[in-house]
């Protein structure tokens, strides 16, 4: 069976994949080249390993279907990698067993303890996810496992990765491959950026023109300096059934899909579909170039507000995520300053210019707060980019700080949850950073510290996680995508998972070759010039 297909058919590789592979019929001990680095590894003085053989049984908790599926897959994977056929059961067995267990009293739901003795392997998680995550520590399995104990848990509860499909569309099949990659790195949130000036990518049944018109553009800019276009139509969108398929696929890997509908800026594709939603009435065209553009949704138009609420209602029906991302970034106010409806709404609301917040910025806060009410009414929470700070924060919003860490600092000081994703470190499509040598390129990600030192201990608790982002203005295919992501996603995973006192860049780079082998085995491409000896940057 193809290894990549096997990996995708059923998630989970076996807790003991903390260790290296061996060939069939060869007993070989594994090593501890693990990414992300566990919090604690203690090798036993007794060097007798646990040996997987035909008498080994994988035991899962009775009546737990998730664990049953995982156990079945482990058996399949062990046979694929070692040639040994093992049994699966929900009945207790004294020895020669790999036991999967859940202990909900553990402090961390995603934490786990892995105990290996010569007689058995016991993997206990704080939840099914806690069992699943160590199962994805590696892409290989050894027939002989060194005795010892691993105690592990994540540093952050939000460990995200974002993919922009608005600028360039990627099919469901490829997104599944990316979700597998996220699972391999213990990432638990897939932030799906679904709408842009250059394309609306999700079916909304009440507004069919969003995909009939908004998902298509005539051409795409391919050279910023010469303004050269490729002259080729670009299109694509996901049906609601396909989106639900992605949600299920991710959930099977304990990953939550966070949808983003970018509002009120970056909405030219929506305006091309329904021009009455803009301040000027159009005509508008789905954009073929990239940047920040003046035409945005009209915040003073009640029809526009109803449109956005209708869209969000359908989105929340598809996506069960606690978080619903509604953008808020890069929204120019020039149209609002001259729009009679926007100015009338400012007057109606009694908005006055403030030293830190213009009237139009406060109008955006009003607009976003109305959407937040809709989101909260469904028991969800609003996520927004750090520009939503500019008009004053909405009551329960979570901030994604992208222009640096300062927005995150400001939000944390106001006791709002924060996810750090600064462009200078964690935008994997940043052209300036991608011109660095591979070693610098890796180091820049690995040594990012998400919790600013200037925050108090109480404020630091509001930094709930961090996220890498891939924007696709200049990323039109999987080769370019993977070159930019890998192996930096491995560095990201240690930021997200491993406590700072257990991190070390030199040791990380020593462990990295094992992960590179896994990428190759699973069919992913990656940037290869990432070690200290590689001093010349490679063209993308």
Model regions: which residues?
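Acidic, contiguous N-terminal accessory segments
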Residues: 22-157, 376-385, 389, 393, ...
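Active-site neighborhood of glycoside hydrolase catalytic domains
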Residues: 270-276, 280, 285-397, 402-414
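Residue-level detector of anion-binding/catalytic polar loops
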Residues: 85, 188-189, 256, 381, ...
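Active-site beta-loop-alpha junctions enriched in small/polar residues
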Residues: 166, 195-199, 262-266, 329-333, ...
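Flexible, acidic glycine-rich loops studded with aromatic residues
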Residues: 381-397, 402-540
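Feature activates predominantly on carbohydrate-active enzymes
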Residues: 107-323, 370, 374, 467-472, ...
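Bacterial Sec-dependent N-terminal signal peptides
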Residues: 1-31
């Amino acid at each position: 069976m193809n290894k990549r297909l096997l990996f995708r058919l059923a998630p989970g590789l076996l807790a003991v994949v903390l260790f290296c592979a061996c060939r069939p019929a060869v007993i070989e001990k594994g090593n501890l080249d693990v990414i992300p680095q566990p919090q604690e590894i203690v090798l036993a003085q007794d060097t007798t390993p646990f040996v997987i053989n035909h008498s080994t049984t994988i035991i899962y908790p009775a009546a737990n279907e998730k664990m049953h599926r995982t156990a079945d897959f482990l058996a399949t994977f062990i046979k694929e990698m070692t040639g040994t056929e093992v049994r699966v059961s929900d009945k207790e067995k004294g020895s020669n067993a790999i036991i999967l267990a859940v202990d909900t009293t553990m402090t961390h739901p995603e934490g786990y303890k892995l105990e290996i003795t010569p007689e058995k392997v016991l993997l206990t998680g704080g939840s099914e996810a806690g069992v699943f995550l160590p199962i994805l520590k590696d892409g290989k399995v050894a027939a002989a496992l060194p005795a010892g104990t691993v105690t592990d848990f994540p540093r952050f509860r939000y460990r995200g990765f974002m993919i922009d499909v608005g600028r360039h569309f990627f099919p469901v099949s490829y997104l599944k491959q990316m979700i597998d990659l996220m699972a391999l790195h213990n990432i638990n949130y897939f932030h799906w950026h679904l709408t842009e000036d250059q394309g609306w990518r999700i079916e909304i049944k009440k507004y069919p023109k969003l995909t009939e018109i908004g998902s298509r553009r005539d051409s795409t800019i391919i050279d910023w300096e010469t303004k050269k276009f490729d002259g080729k139509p670009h299109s694509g969108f996901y049906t609601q059934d396909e989106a639900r398929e992605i949600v299920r696929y991710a959930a099977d890997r304990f990953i939550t899909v966070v949808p983003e509908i970018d509002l009120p800026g970056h909405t030219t594709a929506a305006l091309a579909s329904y021009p009455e939603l803009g301040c000027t009435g159009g005509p508008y065209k789905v954009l073929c170039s990239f940047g920040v553009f003046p035409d945005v949704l009209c915040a003073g138009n009640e029809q526009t507000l109803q449109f956005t609420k209708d869209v969000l209602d359908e989105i929340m029906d598809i996506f069960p995520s606690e978080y619903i991302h509604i953008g808020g970034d890069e929204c120019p106010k020039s149209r609002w300053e001259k729009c009679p409806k926007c100015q009338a709404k400012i007057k109606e609301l009694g908005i006055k210019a403030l030293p830190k917040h213009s009237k139009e910025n406060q109008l955006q806060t009003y607009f976003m707060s109305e959407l937040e009410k809709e989101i909260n009414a469904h028991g969800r929470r609003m996520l927004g980019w750090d520009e939503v700070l500019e008009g004053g924060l909405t009551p329960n919003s979570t901030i994604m700080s992208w222009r640096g860490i300062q927005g995150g600092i400001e939000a944390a000081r106001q006791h709002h949850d924060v996810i750090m994703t600064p462009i200078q470190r964690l935008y994997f499509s940043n052209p300036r950073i991608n011109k660095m040598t591979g070693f610098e390129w890796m180091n820049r990600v690995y040594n990012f510290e998400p919790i600013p030192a200037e925050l108090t201990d109480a404020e630091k608790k509001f930094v709930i996680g961090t996220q890498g982002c891939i924007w696709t203005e200049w990323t039109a295919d999987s080769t370019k995508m993977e070159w930019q992501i890998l192996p930096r996603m491995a560095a990201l995973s240690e930021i997200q998972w491993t406590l700072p006192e257990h991190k070390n860049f030199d040791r990380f780079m020593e462990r990295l070759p094992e992960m590179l082998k896994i990428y190759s085995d699973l069919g992913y491409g990656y940037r290869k010039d990432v070690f200290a000896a590689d001093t010349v940057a490679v063209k993308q």
